[in-house]
Amino acid sequence: THGECEELYFGSYEMYKRFSTYWMDGKGAHAPNVMIDKCSCPNNCGLCSNHLSHSGLANMIVTNRCDLTCWYCFFYVKKGLEGAYMYEPSLDQVRAMMKTLRAERPIPGNSMQITGGEPMLREDIVDVIKIMKEEGVDHIQMNTNGIRFALDPEAMREVRLAGVNNLYLSFDGVTARTNPKNHWEVPYALESARKTGTTVVFVPTVIKSINDHELGGIIRYAQKNLDVVHAVNFQPVSLTGRMGKKEREKYRITIPDCIQRIEEQTNGEVTIDDWFPVPSCMPLTNVIEAFSSKPKYELSIHFACGAGTYIFEDQET
């Protein structure tokens, strides 16, 4: 344990209050893999009946190996570090986890993110994807740095045919300085996705004082590749206690901070008031469910966990 600490959670009180008006509890998961009488939160983590939301996008870590060593990554472990080990579930374990996901009620999990590490380091990654499809998952996206797809377009074709719908592509900035890990490879990875009909979501890890001045540039680059890039998911860096307070304050950035910078860097084209928390879609879900009389997919996460907006390109201006 790390003891007590004080951290900035949400950078705007006004936005917090506005977002809180959209807070709605979901149905929860009625077939949890951790029973309530065994729960000792947070000592035995898992989906228990205390959860008020079902799995929206399930994440499966298929390896903790990576071909990069990004300093801010909470998965990155230096070689030789005491306690470090390789995690890589077998195909049988992958199938067992998929069966657990699909057993959730009232909404069987049907959306999966393959993550790591770098998933493409697994030689049997195509088999992993096929198992997910065999177990009934509709949507599969892969969290990746894209380097393999840039160097080997055939690999993109193989995972697409196996069942991957979308690349969740790490992309931290529009310059080599802010995005040293895959700056040169991203254009080639996009071309591989374009040729195979695979959509892309840019996933910038936003770090204050490092790349928070390029959020508008990232949006504009996505716009230039609108035929293949359908979204940008800005993720404020997760500082997991490996650095001191001064360092954390130097790099810490919250969702409202990102939204404010986007307004500034898009010259007001995307304003602070354009953003809504994830559960703002819940009333529409409830209406559709009322008409269909069947449980519908809910996005009932906490209102401070994320925000979104839509941007439309006007061809006439």
Specify the residue positions occupied by each region the protein language model found.
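Phenylalanine-focused residue identity feature
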Residues: F10, F19-Y22, F74-F75, Y85-Y87, ...
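Radical SAM enzyme [4Fe-4S]-AdoMet core and its adjacent flexible, acidic
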Residues: H183, E191-T317
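Ordered hydrophobic segments in well-structured contexts
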Residues: T1, C5-E7, A307-I311
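Conserved alpha-helical substructure of the radical SAM core
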Residues: G3-Y16, T21-T144, R148-E154, E158
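Generic structural motif
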Residues: S12, R65, V174, V237, ...
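General structural signal for secondary-structure boundaries
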Residues: Y87-M97, P108, Y168, K250-C258, ...
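Radical SAM/AdoMet-radical enzyme domain recognition
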Residues: R95-I114, R122-P236
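A short acidic, helix-capping loop that chelates divalent metal ions and anchors anionic groups
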Residues: G80-E82, T175-N179, R242-K245
